[in-house]
């Protein structure tokens, strides 16, 4: 088992990574008679809720289960209100612990509910998808979507612990696994060239669900995320680099309708557009762009601009991005394999050229 700490002073917390962790009650750091609410979705509940309930029974916790519908289209204020109503109707007090059992949608939504309920209650992240294991469960970003933009309503609120059981990946659909790989590859591009090299060599092992390879990849991603969050919890600086491909990607998700493109799929296509923008700006060379394009293709991810999405469509959504300051668009762009920067003042003509180029890659 790998163990990583997110260092945030009194709000520091552990990330536990490995196979068979759902058999280890100590990782939840709960005590007997504690009240716990597991929030999950209809897909994950039959797969993993019984194991978590068994753990809670072993500890002696009082527990309840809330199942929500599955999908990005349910990451809304309406579903958030369902969680809040459940907590209120059952008269839970501030000592309740909420467990987010599921992928990124569940983690973001439940974390936001925990941040808001009685001004904040403890919650534990138990991510069951690759994307949530390597990215969204770590760092305290919680939110729901709005029709005008993704993750526009939310809070920074850190979990009490993150428990990542790699066995969950054995039930993950291939499309969801590939979507998670987009975020894994992102870490190599923005932060760690040696990890990028390793991913190029180990892609087949990862897709074969090799336990050693998966544990290493997830741990390295969480390590990078923990280092970045410890330096910049609320994204005023270096943490923005974790959004490589997300400005273009969020525009795709919003325009195409939440749930039609998986988040990781949109990030993949967005990463190619960002990399092409970087090349056109002279930040990376053609060979580096081709390596980024090739590894995303190797991971079975979409790399092309959506056919029915114009430059104007992109700009309409991108100008609502949270990195826009004083009306100026800022993009996260690679400056090499393993380094990146937030760049402002990129001419719209260059962005348009990158979007058009990526229609035929």
From Swiss-Prot:
Its EC number is 4.2.3.4. It is found in: Cytoplasm. InterPro entries: Dehydroquinate_synthase, DHQ_synth_AroB, DHQ_synth_fam, DHQS/DOIS_N, DHQS_C. Its main location: cytoplasm. Keywords: Amino-acid biosynthesis, Aromatic amino acid biosynthesis, Cobalt, Cytoplasm, Lyase, Metal-binding, NAD, Nucleotide-binding, Zinc. It comes from Vibrio cholerae serotype O1 (strain ATCC 39315 / El Tor Inaba N16961). It comes from the Bacteria. Belongs to the sugar phosphate cyclases superfamily. Dehydroquinate synthase family. NCBIfam families: aroB (TIGR01357). It is an enzyme of class 4 (lyase). Catalyzes the conversion of 3-deoxy-D-arabino-heptulosonate 7-phosphate (DAHP) to dehydroquinate (DHQ). Zn(2+) binds at residues 183, 246, 263. This is 3-dehydroquinate synthase. Its cofactor is NAD(+); Co(2+); Zn(2+). Binds 1 divalent metal cation per subunit. Can use either Co(2+) or Zn(2+). Pfam families: DHQ_synthase, DHQS_C. Pathway: Metabolic intermediate biosynthesis; chorismate biosynthesis; chorismate from D-erythrose 4-phosphate and phosphoenolpyruvate: step 2/7. HAMAP family: DHQ_synthase. One of its GO terms (cellular component) is cytoplasm. GO terms for biological process: amino acid biosynthetic process; aromatic amino acid family biosynthetic process; chorismate biosynthetic process.
């Amino acid at each position: 088992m790998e163990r990583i700490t997110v260092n945030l002073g009194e709000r520091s917390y552990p990330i536990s990574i490995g196979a068979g962790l759902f058999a280890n009650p100590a990782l939840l750091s709960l005590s007997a008679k504690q009240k716990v609410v597991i929030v999950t979705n209809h897909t994950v509940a039959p797969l993993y809720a019984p194991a978590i309930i068994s753990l809670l029974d072993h500890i002696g916790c009082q527990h309840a289960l809330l199942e929500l519908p599955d999908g990005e289209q349910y990451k809304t204020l309406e579903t958030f209100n369902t969680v809040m109503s459940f907590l209120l109707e059952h008269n839970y007090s501030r000592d309740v612990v909420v467990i987010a059992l599921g992928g990124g949608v569940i983690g973001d939504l439940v974390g936001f509910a925990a941040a808001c309920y009685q001004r904040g209650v403890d919650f534990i992240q138990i991510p069951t998808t690759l994307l949530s294991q390597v990215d969204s469960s770590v760092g305290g970003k919680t939110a729901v979507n709005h029709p005008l933009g993704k993750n526009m309503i939310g809070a920074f609120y850190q979990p009490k612990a993150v428990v990542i059981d790699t066995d969950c990946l054995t039930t993950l659909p291939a499309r969801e696994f590939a979507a998670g790989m987009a975020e894994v590859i992102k870490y190599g591009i923005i932060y760690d060239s040696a990890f990028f090299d390793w991913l190029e060599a180990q892609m087949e092992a990862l897709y074969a669900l090799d336990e050693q390879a998966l544990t290493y990849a997830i741990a390295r991603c969480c390590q990078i995320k923990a280092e970045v969050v410890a330096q910049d919890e609320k994204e005023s600086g270096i943490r923005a680099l974790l959004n490589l491909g997300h400005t273009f990607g969020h525009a795709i998700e919003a325009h195409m309708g939440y749930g039609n493109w998986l988040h990781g799929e949109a990030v993949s296509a967005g990463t190619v557009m960002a990399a092409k923008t970087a090349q056109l700006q002279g930040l990376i060379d053609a060979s580096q762009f081709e390596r980024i394009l090739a590894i995303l293709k190797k991971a079975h991810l979409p790399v092309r601009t959506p056919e029915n999405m114009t430059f104007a469509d992109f700009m309409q959504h991108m100008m609502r991005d949270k990195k826009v300051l004083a009306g100026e668009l800022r993009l996260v762009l690679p400056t090499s394999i393993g380094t990146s920067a937030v760049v402002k003042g990129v001419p719209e003509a260059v962005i348009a050229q990158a979007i058009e180029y990526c229609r035929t890659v």
